[in-house]
Curated annotation (Swiss-Prot):
Gene Ontology MF terms in the entry: collagen V binding; heparin binding
UniProt motif Cell attachment site: location: 275-277
Recorded name of the encoding gene: ECM2
Taxonomic lineage from the root: Eukaryota, Metazoa, Chordata, Craniata, Vertebrata
Gene Ontology CC terms, in alphabetical order: extracellular matrix; extracellular region
Protein name in UniProt: Extracellular matrix protein 2
Cellular localization per UniProt: Secreted, Extracellular space, Extracellular matrix
Length: 680
C-alpha cells in the first residue's frame, strides 16, 4: 500500500514539472511573437527623425593632485616651505608676495581666494597655504550614466537608479532576482498592451456595425470617404517609392534580417529551456546605442564637464557650435585668423574663452564678436597678432590677457565699461608712455593686478587706478621713479621692477616712503650701487639680487614697522667694509631670511648672532676663510638659535679649524652645509 502511494506521488510530481516547463515555453514564445508584431508595425509606419546636436563624450572626473583626501574626508596638506620642511630652500626666481598669498598655476592668489583648477576640485588660499578638496563620487551600477547640469557626480540615465554596492546598510540582490523582476515588469506591460489592442479592435468593430439611422444611407458613401482619406497617403507612398526605390529595398532587407534574427532567437530559446536540475546565468541587460545622425565635435576636440577643448586641432576658423550649456571654450594653439560677429551665437553662456596661440589679427575681429557674451568673465588672447585691444568687450569681464601680441596703442576708449575687471595682463607688446593714454586705466574701478612687463616704458605709467594692489613692470627701460609715480595708488602692495635701468640717485625721496600698504619691492638686476634709502616703512620683502651693491648704509632699515623680514642681496659686490653693526639696525628683531651669497665677503658679517628671528642664512660662494668664536652663537646665552639653514659651502674655510662651540646654539648640525670648500 505504501509503495503504490509513493509511486503515484512521483508520477504526479513529474507531470507537474513537465506541464510547468511547457507553460513557461509557450508564454515566452507568445511574448516574442507579440513584440515581433509590434516591431514590424512600428517599422512600417514610423521613421526615426534625426536631429542635429552634439555628441558628448563620457565625462571623466579628474583627480585632484593636492591635497590628499583620506577616507574619513580629512585633508593632508602638502605645504612646501623651507621654514617647516628641512632641505627645501628659497628660489631666486620667486618674488615673495603679500603675507598670506598663495602661488597657484603661475598666479598669486589672495588670502581666502577660492578657485577651481579642475572640475570637481575646489581650492582655497588660507594664510599662504593651498587647501584643495575633491568631490567623491560613488560608483553607479547601471549600463549608462549622465552628469546633471551643475553636478560633479554621474547618475543613472534611466528612471530607476540602482543602489551602490558599497553602502553598508543595503545588500545588493542577486542577478537572477533582478532578471526575475524585469521579466515580471515586462509581463505586466505585455498584458496592458494586449488589453489596449483588444479595446482598439472592439472600437473598430463598433464603428463598422450599422446603426438604425444608417440604413437609409448608401453603402458606398462610407467607402468613398475612406477612399478620399486613403488617396493622399497612397499617392505620397507611391511618390516616395518612385524617388527612393533603393531605400525601400534596404528597409525591406532590414526587416527580413530582423525576422531571421527573431527566428534564430526563438530556436535558441527552445534549446535553452531552464530545467529544474540546471542553472543558467541571465543575459546582460541591453546597452542603448548612440543615436545615429548626431554630428560629433570637430576632430581633435573633446567635451568634458561643460568645457569644449580644441587644443592643437589644426582649426583655421572657429567651429560652428550650438550648446547653451557650455561655459568654457578652449581653442588653444590653432591657426585661427578671424572672429566673425556671429562666431559665439550658439554659446551664449560662455564664462571662459581661451584663444591663445593663434594668428588672430585686429582687423579680423568683428566689432560685435564678443558683445553678446553676457556671462563672459575670463578672456585669454595671448600669442596672437593684435595691434589694438578688441572693441565692445562685455562688461562682465574680470580677467583679460593679451600678452605676447603687437599692441601699439591704448587710448581712452580701449578699456571703457570694464568696471569689473580685476586682472589685466599686457606683457610682451610695444607699449610705452608715448602710446598709452594717461586716462586709459581710469574706467578700471576694480583693477588690482596689472602686468606691463616686456614693453618699452621709460617711466612708471601715469593714471594708474587707485584700486591697484600689484604692479609688475619687469624688462622695461625705466630709469627713474618720481615723487608722483605712486601718488594715487595708496592700496599698492607689490611692485616688481626687475631688469630695468634704475639707479639709487634716480629714486625720489618721497617716491614711496609714505606708502602704508607697500610690503614687497623687487629691484633686481638694475644699476644700484648701495641699498636705496627712503624705503617704505611698511616694507617686508626687499629683493636686490644681481646689482652692483657694495655696501649697506647704516640705519637704512631703522624706520620700518613692524620690520623687514626678507632681504635678498645675492650676486652683488658686497665687501667686509660695506657692512657694519648698524647696517641691519631696525631689522634684528624681524629678519627671517638673509641672502648674502655670491658676494666678496671674507668674514661673517657683524650682528648675525643678534638676529633672534633668523631662520635662513646664505653665505656660500664668498671668500670666507675662518669662523671666529661668537660670530654665529653667543657663548653667554643658553637659548638655542632659531637658525634652521646655514650655507657656508664654496668658501675657503678649513673645517678642522672651526671652534668646537661655533655652532653650539644650532639645534641640528644637519642644517649646516660646509662642503665643498675651495682650495687655494
Amino acid at each position: 500500500m505504501k509503495f503504490s502511494s509513493l509511486y503515484c506521488f512521483l508520477l504526479l510530481l513529474i507531470f507537474q514539472t513537465d506541464f510547468g516547463q511547457n507553460e513557461e515555453t509557450s508564454r515566452r514564445q507568445r511574448r516574442k511573437m507579440y513584440h515581433r508584431r509590434l516591431r514590424k508595425s512600428s517599422l512600417s509606419t514610423h521613421r526615426s527623425v534625426r536631429q542635429p546636436g552634439i555628441q558628448q563624450m563620457k565625462t571623466v572626473t579628474p583627480a585632484a593632485k593636492l591635497p590628499i583626501i583620506n577616507l574619513d574626508y580629512s585633508i593632508e596638506e602638502n605645504f612646501e616651505s623651507f621654514l617647516s620642511v628641512p632641505g627645501v630652500e628659497s628660489s631666486y626666481n620667486v618674488l615673495p608676495g603679500k603675507k598670506g598669498h598663495c602661488l597657484a598655476n603661475g598666479m598669486i592668489m589672495y588670502n581666502k581666494a577660492v578657485w577651481s583648477p579642475e572640475p570637481c576640485t575646489t581650492c582655497l588660499c588660507l594664510n599662504g597655504k593651498v587647501l584643495c578638496d575633491e568631490t567623491k563620487c560613488h560608483p553607479q551600477m547601471c549600463p549608462q550614466t549622465i552628469i546633471p547640469e551643475g553636478e560633479c557626480c554621474p547618475v543613472c540615465s534611466n528612471t530607476e537608479q540602482r543602489e551602490p554596492t558599497n553602502l553598508p546598510h543595503k545588500q545588493q540582490s542577486p542577478p537572477w532576482e533582478e532578471m526575475n523582476r524585469a521579466l515580471r515588469k515586462e509581463e505586466l506591460q505585455l498584458e496592458e498592451d494586449e488589453e489596449e489592442v483588444k479595446q482598439d479592435e472592439n472600437r473598430e468593430q463598433k464603428k463598422k456595425t450599422f446603426r438604425p439611422g444608417d440604413w437609409g444611407r448608401p453603402i458606398n458613401e462610407g467607402q468613398s470617404r475612406e477612399g478620399k482619406a486613403q488617396r493622399p497617403e497612397e499617392e505620397g507612398r507611391q511618390a516616395h517609392q518612385h524617388r527612393n526605390p533603393a531605400r525601400e529595398n534596404e528597409e525591406d532587407d532590414d526587416e527580413e534580417e530582423e525576422d531571421d534574427d527573431d527566428e534564430e532567437e526563438d530556436d535558441d530559446d527552445e534549446d535553452e529551456t531552464i530545467r529544474g536540475d540546471t542553472f543558467r546565468m541571465p543575459p546582460r541587460l541591453p546597452i542603448p546605442a548612440t543615436p545615429r545622425g548626431i554630428p560629433s565635435l570637430p576632430s581633435m576636440c573633446s567635451l568634458s564637464y561643460k568645457t569644449i577643448s580644441c587644443i592643437s586641432a589644426d582649426l583655421t576658423q572657429i567651429p560652428p557650435l550650438t550648446a547653451p550649456e557650455i561655459t568654457s571654450l578652449e581653442l588653444i594653439d590653432n591657426s585661427i585668423t578671424s572672429i566673425p560677429d556671429e562666431a559665439f551665437n550658439g554659446l551664449p553662456n560662455l564664462e571662459r574663452l581661451d584663444l591663445s596661440k593663434n594668428n588672430i589679427t585686429s582687423s579680423g575681429i568683428g566689432p560685435k564678436a564678443f558683445k553678446f557674451l553676457k556671462n563672459l568673465m575670463r578672456l585669454n588672447m595671448d600669442g596672437n597678432n593684435l595691434v589694438t585691444i578688441p572693441s565692445e568687450l562685455p562688461s562682465t569681464l574680470e580677467e583679460l590677457k593679451i600678452n605676447e601680441n603687437k599692441l601699439q596703442v591704448i587710448d581712452e576708449e580701449s578699456l571703457s565699461d570694464l568696471n569689473q575687471l580685476v586682472t589685466l595682463e599686457l606683457e610682451g607688446n610695444n607699449l610705452s608712455e608715448t602710446n598709452v593714454n594717461s586716462l586709459a586705466f581710469k574706467p578700471l574701478k576694480s583693477l588690482s593686478y596689472l602686468r606691463l612687463g616686456r614693453n618699452k616704458f621709460r617711466i612708471i605709467p601715469q593714471g594708474l587706478p587707485a584700486s591697484i594692489e600689484e604692479l609688475y613692470l619687469e624688462n622695461n627701460q625705466i630709469e627713474e621713479i618720481t615723487e608722483i609715480s605712486f601718488n594715487h595708488t595708496r592700496k599698492i602692495n607689490v611692485i616688481g621692477l626687475r631688469y630695468n635701468k634704475i639707479e639709487e640717485n634716480r629714486i625720489a625721496p618721497l617716491a614711496w616712503i609714505n606708502q602704508e600698504n607697500l610690503e614687497s619691492i623687487d629691484l633686481s638686476y638694475n644699476k644700484l650701487y648701495h641699498v636705496p634709502s627712503y624705503l617704505p616703512k611698511s616694507l617686508v620683502h626687499l629683493v636686490l639680487i644681481g646689482n652692483q651693491i657694495e655696501r649697506i648704509p647704516g640705519y637704512v632699515f631703522g624706520h620700518m614697522e613692524p620690520g623687514l623680514e626678507y632681504l635678498y642681496l645675492s650676486f652683488n659686490k658686497l665687501v667686509d667694509d660695506g657692512i657694519d653693526r648698524v647696517s641691519f639696525y631696525g631689522a634684528y628683531h624681524s629678519l627671517r631670511e638673509l641672502f648674502l651669497d655670491h658676494n666678496e665677503l671674507k668674514s661673517i658679517p657683524p650682528g648675525v648672532q643678534e638676529m633672534k628671528a633668523l631662520h635662513f642664512l646664505r653665505l656660500n660662494n664668498n671668500k670666507i676663510r675662518n669662523i671666529l668664536p661668537e660670530q654665529i652663537c653667543n657663548a653667554e646665552e643658553d637659548d638655542d638659535s632659531n637658525l634652521q639653514h646655514l650655507h657656508l659651502e664654496n668658501n675657503y674655510i678649513k673645517t678642522r679649524e672651526i671652534p668646537s662651540y661655533a655652532f653650539s646654539c644650532i639645534r641640528s648640525y644637519s642644517s649646516i652645509v660646509l662642503k665643498p670648500q675651495n682650495i687655494k
